[in-house]
């Protein structure tokens, strides 16, 4: 039994009386006219137009004429308009806007002059939420407003079944006899199908079995519903048992029954069983229809038995059952599945010559097969037909396949036409579609065309559309970014990649290319910004990118920033080469940043890179540090050199310091050499001692000379007597006496050594 889903006409009868002014036309103020949602003229039940007297007819006609000639004047409050909303719509709006409370229930009760089943049905049908409909259904009955009939029960059961509220639906169904409403088969069919859609096959079977216990007749309608439910879940053996039981009960299967059985058997891949039922169908004198043939053809195609499918297809035409677009599409799909593309094209041409227009499913089936077979000319022509007829395929991934296949075939013009076809068919092109074209244009060295596509991609911000699922691949954006960075268009490349980063892309190659590109173009600050982004996101930085960035800073005359970039390079585990170290150190030194240059030199020494090649530069920095009073720093660098197996020229440094009067620095450097037993020339001792004595620092000279002699180093310092004299003059007689004895002792040892020789 079919059910009508549209709203029913509501008619009401008055149960209240209003105080109205008298009028000769009583029908003008009839209560149904005032309260009914549908305005219509009602006549008494016993008033048959054919049996009315002529006087009554003339009186009625007179009243109608007077009503038409006399205008009805009604006054409304200013600013308000008459509400023509239907009563059921008003109730639905109230339930949607207000909580389900006693106050709302009373408002609805006061609104309705008299309840009838059509009003309840329409409210259930118009409710925006299921819980509102269920509350209204239960309230109207519990409040004694109405006793639900068969239609309202059926409506509620269907609504609950659609949202899988199956326990509620079942309770309402089983409670119907207590309310005096008899069951019918259609209600159980709804519940069987609802359980089936929810995947609860066992409950569908129980409901079907319960029909017999409850005395509800089971016809072919309920059997068909059961077959559909159990076959959808692959229970073909159960379906066979119930089919045999149905036949034994005297219920004759229909063509629809056999179509369901065949569909289910093929779904479960039971070819032999399907063939037996097909023959049984013919034996019973039931002729196959187009649905039967289509099911069988589709089944043969699933088993890749295209010869059998072709025979059925021919038989279908011989039985004067014209193949439909479904039949042709199924055959095309089957041939493509077994790589018989030419046969698929033959069926397609036959279809068109028969006057049957391909639909979106047909095109969606044929195009991927042509692409896989490399028949791109045919695919191009079919795409043109789709554009001419404005038929878009069901699956938009077909366009991606066309783009890839046409590009692979080397026909970039045809690939570009695919984008135009998408625009014609109102299919939005995604970033992935543009990516395929850009990638293949780069492979063909057609960079200008690739850049035009990229401009469109960037301007329309296609990459940023969150509803898109087809993203641009690294193989697409990396080549164009590299080209732009190598050809003075790094800014455009950065705009592209910043859009990609908003979609979560953190590609190492692309970011390093951006650093290199900005550095080559003389924009080191932009390179460093990219570098910081990579650092924050943990993206590895390449050594070559750092080198270009450092050189870019130095070419701009910014050695400090170059040093910062070099520090980052070292922190990332990269080791700059000797020439890069030298260029940074020299730039800093020439800029007067001696200590900063010293720190870079320390890194170079620590990494043991190019020390021998840069000893001249190291000597300059050490000298500058000592001359500026940064003695401890200089000594630290010298010590680091020694630890790495290299020796600074201390004699040269001592000579320079002594000559320029930097006695304290010379003293500390000499002490450093003596403490570590470094090899020093005697002339260096003499120069330092002379400088100290000349500066009046007799005690310092005394201390140094004592250390020299304690180390066993003999000295022929000519000014030793002068030092002793100065010590005595300054009152340091004790030191003078000690020094005299040490000198005499040293001279005695020297004489003994000469005699022994």
Swiss-Prot record:
Main localization is: mitochondrion
UniProt-listed InterPro entries:
Pentatricopeptide_rpt (IPR002885), PPR-containing_protein (IPR050667), TPR-like_helical_dom_sf (IPR011990)
Localization, UniProt: Mitochondrion
SUPFAM superfamilies referenced in this protein's UniProt entry, alphabetically: HCP-like (SSF81901)
Here the segments flagged for biased composition (Polar residues) are 39-55
Where in the sequence is the signal peptide annotated? none
**Classification via Pfam families:** PPR, PPR_2, PPR_3
Among the GO molecular function terms of this UniProt record, one is:
mRNA binding
Please cite one Gene Ontology biological process associated with this protein.
response to cold
Q: What Gene3D superfamilies would the database entry show?
A: Tetratricopeptide repeat domain
The ranges of region (Disordered) come to 39-82
PPR repeat intervals: 149-183, 184-218, 219-253, 254-288, 289-323, 324-358, 359-393, 395-429, 430-464, 473-507, 510-541, 542-576, 577-611, 614-648, 651-680, 681-715
Can you cite an annotated GO cellular component? ribonucleoprotein complex
Record keywords: Mitochondrion, Repeat, Ribonucleoprotein, Ribosomal protein
- Give the protein family: Belongs to the PPR family. P subfamily.
The record's note on quaternary structure and interaction partners says: Component of the mitochondrial ribosome large subunit.
Against NCBIfam families, the record matches this protein to: PPR
Protein name (database record):
Large ribosomal subunit protein mL102 (rPPR5)
